[in-house]
């Protein structure tokens, strides 16, 4: 009978939906101005949030619970304009678990780059975007 309780407890704690792990919200803000939209497509190994268009001055957000092994990551593609694509990790457990995103990961996209908010130190930091090369014959 005791082994049954151990299995039930383990399955609860290992479940991503359990209340044991805090909810983390990711919010990506388009602050490019002049009415310029950005296409955003975020995904993890378990979730695909599909393509979304975020108009200037607006945000997109999603939330999730960290997995038991702290390996959760969400990668986002940004379609800056018809020719330019960038990518970045909007959440990466190894980078963000130590206070940078304890409950909320804030990202601000501006003309001069991508800024991430560090919750622990209460500062905005600039991040490097990974430029994606356009392949010939593909749109």
UniProtKB/Swiss-Prot annotation:
Residues 1-19 form the signal peptide. Keywords: Glycoprotein, Secreted, Self-incompatibility, Signal. GO terms for cellular component: extracellular region. Its main location: secreted. It is found in: Secreted. Glycosylated (S1b) and unglocosylated (S1a) forms coexist. It comes from the Eukaryota. Pfam families: Self-incomp_S1. One of its GO terms (biological process) is rejection of self pollen. Glycans are attached at residue 51. Accumulates in the stigma (at protein level). Exhibits specific pollen self-inhibitory activity thus preventing self-fertilization. Belongs to the plant self-incompatibility (S1) protein family. This is Self-incompatibility protein S1. It comes from Papaver rhoeas. The lineage of its organism: Eukaryota, Viridiplantae, Streptophyta, Embryophyta, Tracheophyta.
